[in-house]
Amino acid sequence: NLYQFKNMIHCTVPSRPWWHFADYGCYCGRGGKGTPVDDLDRCCQVHDNCYEKAGKMGCWPYLTLYKYKCSQGKLTCSGGNSKCGAAVCNCDLVAANCFAGARYIDANYNINFKKRCQ
């Protein structure tokens, strides 16, 4: 669920508050459209698409609980998750790892969505 995703982000990117990823580019946060502004925004676009796919499986990605571990910045999803738990955990794990490898550009935080995301 979103609370667990927030904690995953903190695991892989402890140096930056999670809310910096909640209003970034065209895809991090409020849904998304248009062309991603950078690699970090592409991480969010992939995450959105992953959640959409999980939804088509009958899952509720924003609410689905799952089990995972964080150890020294490394995430693993537990093997005992339900079908939906496994799918959503994987979506969140891939995104959190992607965030860790992408450059954060301050100018792409809280951008003018109407102008830049068409």
UniProtKB/Swiss-Prot annotation:
Record EC number: 3.1.1.4
Key word Secreted present: yes
Pfam families: Phospholip_A2_1
One GO MF term attached to the UniProt entry: calcium ion binding
Motif Coagulation factor Xa binding motif positions after renumbering to this chain: 52-69
Cofactor note: Binds 1 Ca(2+) ion.
GO cellular component: extracellular region
Principal cellular location given in the protein's record: secreted
Organism superkingdom: Eukaryota
Keywords per UniProt: Blood coagulation cascade inhibiting toxin, Calcium, Disulfide bond, Hemostasis impairing toxin, Hydrolase, Lipid degradation, Lipid metabolism, Metal-binding, Secreted, Toxin
Residues at the active site: H47, D92
Gene3D superfamilies registered for this protein in UniProt: Phospholipase A2 domain
Signal peptide coordinates: none
Catalytic reaction equation(s): a 1,2-diacyl-sn-glycero-3-phosphocholine + H2O = a 1-acyl-sn-glycero-3-phosphocholine + a fatty acid + H(+)
InterPro entries: PLipase_A2, PLipase_A2_Asp_AS, PLipase_A2_dom, PLipase_A2_dom_sf, PLipase_A2_His_AS
Extra facts: Negative results: does not bind to coagulation factor FVa (F5) or prothrombin.
Function field: Snake venom phospholipase A2 (PLA2) that shows strong anticoagulant activity. Binds directly with the coagulation factor FXa (F10) and blocks the formation of the prothombinase complex. Acts by a nonenzymatic mechanism. Also inhibits the complex composed of tissue factor (F3) and coagulation factor VIIa (F7) (TF-VIIa complex) by both enzymatic and nonenzymatic mechanisms. PLA2 catalyzes the calcium-dependent hydrolysis of the 2-acyl groups in 3-sn-phosphoglycerides.
Family designation: Belongs to the phospholipase A2 family. Group I subfamily. D49 sub-subfamily.
Name of the protein this chain belongs to: Phospholipase A2 'basic'
Source organism: Naja nigricollis (Black-necked spitting cobra)
